[in-house]
Swiss-Prot record:
This protein's name: Maturase K
GO molecular function: RNA binding
Keywords attached to this entry: Chloroplast, mRNA processing, Plastid, RNA-binding, tRNA processing
Species name: Beaucarnea recurvata
Encoding gene (name): matK
InterPro entries: Domain_X (IPR024937), Maturase_MatK (IPR002866), Maturase_MatK_N (IPR024942)
Amino acid sequence: MEELQGYLEKDRSRQQHFLYPLLFQEYIYALAHNHGLNGSIFYEPVEVFGYDNKSSLVLVKRLIIRIYQQNFWISLVNDSNQNRFVGYNHNNFFXSHFYSQMISESFAIIVEIPFSLRLVSYFEEKEIPKYHNLRSIHSIFPFLEDKLSHLNYVSDILIPHPIHMEILVQILQCWIQDVPFLHLLRFFLHEYHNLNSLLITQKKSIYVFSKENKRLFRFLYNSYVFEWEFLLVFIRKQSSYLRLTSSGTFLERTHFYEKIEHLQIEHFVVVCRNYFHRTLWFCKDPFMHYVRYQGKAILASKGTHLLMKKCKYHFFNFWQYYFHVWSQPYRIHLNQLSNYSFYFLGYLSSLLLNFSAVRNQMLENSFLIDTITKKFDTIVPVIFLIGSLAKAKFCTVSGHPISKPIWTDLSDSDILDRFGRICRNLSHYHSGSSKKQGLYRIKYILRLSCARTLARKHKSTVRTFLRRLGSGLLEEFFTEEEQVLSLIFPKATPFILHGSHRERIWYLDIICINDLVNHS
């Protein structure tokens, strides 16, 4: 436990005292958008009620100046109380909702500044080139291809929820020693909860956030997940023979945050002393790997089934004792990798076993040696994608293409552009699939849906419309993967295109998941 205590207290200088003076200064506008922050991977444009970036940021700057004005807070609280107990007032409700959104944007911008600058300085110190490529969702799949083929068991974890708002504030208290900010954040969360807009409830996952306030709540969610992932980092460091100095994690914004090596958790030591000091031995597995995505996580290991069951048991106790969250057993599924397929970031992933026989000749005797090789395989989940297309009104639940009536008011070029963009994005994202036949079916549905939409607009049949304009009209807007490959590898096209339906390609420019892919 002395080692754990030192691990927690080694770097207390990382605690932040930044917010108290900044809230009283107008220059936060310039500080939040200096060259270092705009160039970092933390930066995202602020989008507020459809305003452009310049207008919305001006509103953020003005709101920061008004945050501590007494009349503003009294008006905001009175408006929210009137809406709850007196009746619905559209103007007051809109004003309260608008200011709540602006406050959350202000919080998010301010609180990201030190973490962003620290991350940029870290990459400059380590001289890591092209770290923007680490943002790509596809960058995690080569890691899985390299590691999972050597492992035996995988635990599919659904991160527990809900998490109480007060616990979220306490988590930030470990990082930020600014009392006014914590009180202000607590007040805002409670008022926002009273307006029934905060989506941290028992019926909805903490991963699903309000569209209007997603920036702040993503930060709070990442703080919550970072807290319980810290235990994995500590145990991994204790069990690893190499004693790794750092580890990385993909957060929900698909940005690559470098895991902070030291995290100050005051009462975490008490929990570990009372419970985990007898059980740290169970994770002494040098082949344990952890990946988190979309409110879920995968914990894979080369250990035995008994070891993984112990990990599952201690996860439940950790969530219960530390976060006061009751987690049901169904939230962790333990399976053997060779007999299990799991949905992961838009792909149906599994571990394939290839059996082969090798004839060995020794003097006059010959015998066969059976060998087994493992391969990490990713395919397109056709059924799920068809369900997403049906939900978006591109086809029926059985996969029969239908027209998109809501788009018939657009011009022909806009209709073709929309369908073509969706088709190209899906092809680009699922380029890592080992079997492209399912992707061809999705393309066929989109093409025929596009043709039906155009025919409906011109009050004609699909056959008549295509006969008049030619079937090549659609080909221009649906770039095939082979054409993309020929542009990337012009000199090696014949070799690459041979069997291209089986080739897997991972791109380093995919930083978000298409809504049609993100159906989980």
